[in-house]
C-alpha cells in the first residue's frame, strides 16, 4: 500500500480518532462501515473521511464500505500500537501528577515508566501507587541511556520548558508532548506536539459566544 508522505496535519491529528472509532466498531461486532457511519461517529462530514483515507491508497471499495477489522489493524500499524511505547514524564506538578495516575495502557499501548522533577522535590526517590519511579532531573541522561525510550511528556513551568527540552533531546528523546504555552526550539528530526489548555479553553469560549450571538 502506497502512503502519501504529504499528509496534512489536520488529517494526521484525526488518525488516532479513526483508530478509536474502528476499535469501537470492532467491539460492537460491526463488520463493514460506510464513510457516513465513520463521519457520524467522528462528528465530521463523509467527504472529509474519504479525503483523509485517500492519502493511504485503497482502503475500501466504493459502495462496499470499509472492512472494520482490516482498518482497525491498519491504523494500529500506522500508530505503532501493536507494541507498548514507553514514555517518560518531566514535571510532577498538578498536571504531571494527574498524568502519572492516568492509565494510558488501559486504552492504548502507551505507558509512562519514569517521572522526573527537580532534585529537591519530595517526590524524588519515591514511586507512584502504580509503581512508577520518580527521579531527579539531573539523572535523566543516566536513566535514559540504553533504555530505548524516545518519547517524553513535558509539564514543567514555561520558564524552564526550553532548558528541559534541550536536556531531553541531549538524552536521546525524539518526541515531546509539551504542555508549556510556548514554541520550543528543537533540531530537525525532533517532533514537538503542544497542548495549550488556556488556548483551547479560550477557543471554546469564543465558539460558545459566537453560538450565543447566532
Swiss-Prot record:
The keyword NAD applies. Residues 17-56 bind DNA. One of its GO terms (molecular function) is DNA-binding transcription factor activity. It comes from the Bacteria. Keywords: Cytoplasm, DNA-binding, NAD, Repressor, Transcription, Transcription regulation. NAD(+) binds at residues 91-96. Pfam families: CoA_binding, Put_DNA-bind_N. InterPro entries: CoA-bd, NAD(P)-bd_dom_sf, Rex_DNA-bd_C_dom, Tscrpt_rep_Rex, WH-like_DNA-bd_sf, WH_DNA-bd_sf. It is found in: Cytoplasm. One of its GO terms (cellular component) is cytoplasm. SUPFAM superfamilies: NAD(P)-binding Rossmann-fold domains (SSF51735), Winged helix' DNA-binding domain (SSF46785). GO terms for biological process: negative regulation of DNA-templated transcription; response to redox state. Belongs to the transcriptional regulatory Rex family. Homodimer. Modulates transcription in response to changes in cellular NADH/NAD(+) redox state. This is Redox-sensing transcriptional repressor Rex.
